[in-house]
């Protein structure tokens, strides 16, 4: 079996180490309404279409109960739409600052292309958001062959449609000749639902939720413990493989190709 294409996520996988761009904005739009949410809560639905992310936050029991305590009712679809509009406005202003390729990504992409492998991508950002991110990332040397957003298909993650559209546009089939790599639980589900080899990357991921500085300064034993928690979470949600950095991706590909592994 030969791997013919790799489909990458964006924030937390190829750009925006730690996936910090949306995090503070999610927390801010709830805080403005007197409902405090933690970074851990804000990260949990990461990878979903952003309005679905806001909706998922309002459905968390603790957050819903706090909202009910303050407003005397549960969040409505109108509340969700209003918060999402605020989220978009704030995020658009800061996105250019969070589009730098993560260390090592450009080198891995170049190596894959030398092997004739096509590069696709999926995201939880809208097309309008990605117009900003993709343009800035391209200026800094990262440009996949194809990009699909949830706006381009009937539904975003965990549905497989973005991966299928990549496959069609890149001209690659069957799906087990492709790898999906991402940094969230929804990425793992997307890849598995699409019938692809699915890989979770840990350092720089939203699931780990640490900045480069925090990783560098953390006690090695504590960091190792956090890495293993994320690794287990990826595996529990369908990852065939986990890697700590993007530089390990090609060794995963070689395992798939040389051992003639079968997707299960």
From Swiss-Prot:
InterPro entries xref list: HAD-like_hydrolase_sf, HAD-like_sf, HAD-SF_hydro_IA, HAD_sf, PGP-like_dom2, Phosphonoacetald_hydro
Q: Does the keyword Protein transport apply?
A: no
Q: Where is the active site?
A: 9 (nucleophile), 50 (schiff-base intermediate with substrate)
- EC number from the UniProt entry: 3.11.1.1
Domain of life of the organism encoding this protein? Bacteria
Uppermost EC category = hydrolase
Keyword vocabulary terms for this entry: Hydrolase, Magnesium, Metal-binding, Schiff base
Pfam families attached here? Hydrolase
Query: What GO molecular-function term can you cite, just one?
Result: phosphoglycolate phosphatase activity
Q: What does the note under cofactor report?
A: Binds 1 Mg(2+) ion per subunit.
A single Gene Ontology biological process assigned to it is:
DNA repair
Keyword ATP-binding on entry: no
The residues that hold Mg(2+) are 9, 11, 183
Per its Swiss-Prot or TrEMBL entry, what cofactor is needed? Answer: Mg(2+)
Q: What reaction(s) does this enzyme catalyze?
A: phosphonoacetaldehyde + H2O = acetaldehyde + phosphate + H(+)
The family assignment reads: Belongs to the HAD-like hydrolase superfamily. PhnX family.
Q: What does this protein do?
A: Involved in phosphonate degradation.
Please give the HAMAP family that the UniProt record associates with this protein: PhnX (MF_01375)
- Provide the protein name: Phosphonoacetaldehyde hydrolase
Task: Look up and give the organism this protein is from.
Answer: Bacillus cereus (strain ZK / E33L)
Point out the gene that encodes the protein: phnX
């Amino acid at each position: 079996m030969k791997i013919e294409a790799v489909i990458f996520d964006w924030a937390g996988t190829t750009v925006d180490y730690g996936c910090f761009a949306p995090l503070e904005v999610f927390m801010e739009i709830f805080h403005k309404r007197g409902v405090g949410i933690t970074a851990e809560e804000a990260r949990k639905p990461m990878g979903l279409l952003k309005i679905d992310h806001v909706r998922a936050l309002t459905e968390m029991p603790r957050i819903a109960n706090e909202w009910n305590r303050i407003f005397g009712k549960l969040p409505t679809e109108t509340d969700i739409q209003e918060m999402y509009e605020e989220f978009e406005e704030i995020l658009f202003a800061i996105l250019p600052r969070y589009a730098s390729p993560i260390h090592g990504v450009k080198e891995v992409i170049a190596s894959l292309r030398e092997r004739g492998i096509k590069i696709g991508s999926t995201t939880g950002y809208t097309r309008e958001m990605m117009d900003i991110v993709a343009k800035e990332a391209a200026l800094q040397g990262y440009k996949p062959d194809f990009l699909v957003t949830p706006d381009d298909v009937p539904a975003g993650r965990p549905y497989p449609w973005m991966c299928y559209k990549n496959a069609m546009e890149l001209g690659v089939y069957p799906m087990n000749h492709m790898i999906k790599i991402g940094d969230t639980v929804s990425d793992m589900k997307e890849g598995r639902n699409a019938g692809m080899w699915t890989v979770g990357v840990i350092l720089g991921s939203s699931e780990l939720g640490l900045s480069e500085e925090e990783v560098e300064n953390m006690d090695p034993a504590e960091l190792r413990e956090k890495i293993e928690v994320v690794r287990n979470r990826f595996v529990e949600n369908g990852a065939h493989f986990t890697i700590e950095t993007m530089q390990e991706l090609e060794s995963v590909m070689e395992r798939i190709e040389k051992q003639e592994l079968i997707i299960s």
